[in-house]
C-alpha cells in the first residue's frame, strides 16, 4: 500500500475497518497513556514532541504527549487528554478520539495505551517548558512508511528487545515512539 498521498479519509476508513485487538490483561503494570495526535489537513500530520533535556526519564527523546494515569483520571483516554493539555496545551474538547491501539509495555514498568485522536490544524500549541523542548509535525504519510524504521536488537537483563530507529529532519525518532508509529501503520494495513 502506497502512502505518498494519504488523506485523512483514507486513514480513518483504514483505521475503522481494521479495529485493534486489545488485550485487557494489565499484568499488574502501572498504567500510562499517550495521545497520537493526527492533525486534520488534506495531507494529515502527526504531532510529536521532544522532551526536555532536564527530565529524569527519557530526556531529549521524541515522544507523544502522555504520561501516567493518576487518581483524577477516569480512564486511560482521560489521562492521554489531560497529559496532552498539560504538555502542549491541546484542549481535550478539541480532540476527536477515534480509538486506541493495543497497550505497550515500557522499559520503565508502565503499560502504555496509545490513544488515537484527530485535532484541528489551527491549534496554538504551547509547550510546557518543564516537560517539552519542541513541538513539531511530521507528515502522516512519511511517518507511516515502514521502510524508514530500522531495527536494533538490544540485550538487557538476559532478554532480547527490538527497538526501531528513524530520523525526521533533525529529530531522532526511536524506541517506544517509533514502535507505536509502526504499530499504527500496521494497524491500517501498511505492509512491511
UniProtKB/Swiss-Prot annotation:
<dbReference type="InterPro" id="IPR000086">
    <property type="entry name" value="NUDIX_hydrolase_dom"/>
</dbReference>
<dbReference type="Pfam" id="PF00293">
    <property type="entry name" value="NUDIX"/>
</dbReference>
<dbReference type="InterPro" id="IPR045121">
    <property type="entry name" value="CoAse"/>
</dbReference>
<dbReference type="GO" id="GO:0030145">
    <property type="term" value="F:manganese ion binding"/>
</dbReference>
<feature type="binding site">
    <location>
        <position position="87"/>
    </location>
    <ligand>
        <name>Mg(2+)</name>
    </ligand>
</feature>
<dbReference type="InterPro" id="IPR023735">
    <property type="entry name" value="Nudix_NudL"/>
</dbReference>
<comment type="similarity">
    <text>Belongs to the Nudix hydrolase family. PCD1 subfamily.</text>
</comment>
<comment type="function">
    <text>Probably mediates the hydrolysis of some nucleoside diphosphate derivatives.</text>
</comment>
<keyword id="KW-0464">Manganese</keyword>
<keyword id="KW-0479">Metal-binding</keyword>
<keyword id="KW-0460">Magnesium</keyword>
<protein>
    <recommendedName>
        <fullName>Uncharacterized Nudix hydrolase NudL</fullName>
        <ecNumber>3.6.1.-</ecNumber>
    </recommendedName>
</protein>
<dbReference type="GO" id="GO:0010945">
    <property type="term" value="F:coenzyme A diphosphatase activity"/>
</dbReference>
<dbReference type="InterPro" id="IPR000059">
    <property type="entry name" value="NUDIX_hydrolase_NudL_CS"/>
</dbReference>
<feature type="binding site">
    <location>
        <position position="83"/>
    </location>
    <ligand>
        <name>Mg(2+)</name>
    </ligand>
</feature>
<keyword id="KW-0378">Hydrolase</keyword>
<feature type="short sequence motif" description="Nudix box">
    <location>
        <begin position="67"/>
        <end position="89"/>
    </location>
</feature>
<dbReference type="GO" id="GO:0000287">
    <property type="term" value="F:magnesium ion binding"/>
</dbReference>
<feature type="domain" description="Nudix hydrolase">
    <location>
        <begin position="29"/>
        <end position="160"/>
    </location>
</feature>
<dbReference type="InterPro" id="IPR015797">
    <property type="entry name" value="NUDIX_hydrolase-like_dom_sf"/>
</dbReference>
<dbReference type="GO" id="GO:0009132">
    <property type="term" value="P:nucleoside diphosphate metabolic process"/>
</dbReference>
